[in-house]
Amino acid sequence: MDAIADTVFQGTKSKTQEIEDTPSLLTVVVDTSIHSWVQLTKQQSGSGSEGSSGEKQLIEALKSIVVFLNAHLAFNSGNQVCLIAAHSEGMKYLYPSADSKPSMSMVSSDMYRGFRNVDEIVVEQWYRLFKEELEGQESKVSMKSSLSGAMSSALTYVNRILKENENTSLRSRLLVITCGTSQGKDEIFQYIPIMNCIFSATKMKCSIDVVKIGGGIESTFLQQATDATSGVYLHVENTRGLIQYLSTAMFIDPSLRNVIIKPNQGSVDFRTSCFLTGKVVAVGFVCSVCLCVLSVIPPGQKCPACDSPFDSKIIARLRRKPVLSNGVPKKKNVSNK
């Protein structure tokens, strides 16, 4: 009996499936504008708290991001990470960084080398960026976030890495962590750059994930970016428990997102905003050069975004009011029954 069983098991071919563990490139863009984080803290506390509370929330977000990057590196030895900060004066590569010389004694020397390199460089570069942000606050420079520019730089970095690794299959995805306020006026002027990022990410098959912290209004353009690239959009109240959101919703593999229910919140608003007034419009005027959407005809007969001149005949036709027959408006027939 044992001999029969041995021959049966020896003759049976086990169907072994080779699981392909493809390395992945994770690029994270973080909105580090101190002004935005201070505004968020004031809205949540309801008091005029100073910048220290905003910096505290930003540091809590940094801790979660570092753990998230280390977890991504732990999944596969071939995984790569990139961290970009969008601050008030532009964007900066926090990791990898060409001018970094890690010398942070607060990082344990017994840590895994891959984690230690990321932690040391990120903490050092973030410390330098904090000093620059505080100096910018004292000099009262522009406090607008450059989120769209950082997203463009992130996609440029992804494209370069994919070109360098053409022989090996490498997946890529982009995660955007932004701080939202109740106004969201700065996002209106980033509409065209964000649309360009959506087109580029779609062409590269790079999914865009978004985590918005705070704010009462959803980020319309970032929602459209996640929907167009099969990404995940999450709106959380604060930085508490951020690592739990990152380690669950943002770790879903892009190849599995078509067969599972993504943790997206609500429906996507596909309407756009007027470049001049900032109002959400469903019907408006569109520039044929840069696709800028306007709810009113701009003064000077030029596009406010790309400065392209408009045809005077078309402008006159658009400003012409509808003319009724015989020049007299028709009266409504009201019949009393």
Swiss-Prot record:
The gene behind this protein is TFB4
Instruction: Assign the protein's first listed, main location to one coarse class.
Output: nucleus
Pfam families linked: Tfb4
Self-association and partners: Component of the 7-subunit TFIIH core complex composed of XPB/SSL2, XPD/RAD3, SSL1, TFB1, TFB2, TFB4 and TFB5, which is active in NER. The core complex associates with the 3-subunit CTD-kinase module TFIIK composed of CCL1, KIN28 and TFB3 to form the 10-subunit holoenzyme (holo-TFIIH) active in transcription.
Where can this protein be found? Answer: Nucleus
Q: SUPFAM superfamilies, alphabetically? A: vWA-like
Enumerate the Gene Ontology biological process terms. nucleotide-excision repair; regulation of DNA-templated transcription
- What InterPro entries does the record tag this protein with? TFIIH_Tfb4/GTF2H3, vWFA_dom_sf
Q: What organism is recorded for this protein? A: Kluyveromyces lactis (strain ATCC 8585 / CBS 2359 / DSM 70799 / NBRC 1267 / NRRL Y-1140 / WM37) (Yeast)
A GO CC annotation given for this chain: transcription factor TFIIH holo complex
Q: What is this protein called?
A: General transcription and DNA repair factor IIH subunit TFB4
**Where are the zinc-finger regions (C4-type) in this chain?**
287-306
What Gene Ontology molecular function terms does this protein carry? zinc ion binding
Q: Keyword set for this entry?
A: DNA damage, DNA repair, Metal-binding, Nucleus, Transcription, Transcription regulation, Zinc, Zinc-finger
Organism's domain of life? Eukaryota
Role according to the record: Component of the general transcription and DNA repair factor IIH (TFIIH) core complex, which is involved in general and transcription-coupled nucleotide excision repair (NER) of damaged DNA and, when complexed to TFIIK, in RNA transcription by RNA polymerase II. In NER, TFIIH acts by opening DNA around the lesion to allow the excision of the damaged oligonucleotide and its replacement by a new DNA fragment. In transcription, TFIIH has an essential role in transcription initiation.
Query: Which family is this protein grouped under?
Result: Belongs to the TFB4 family.
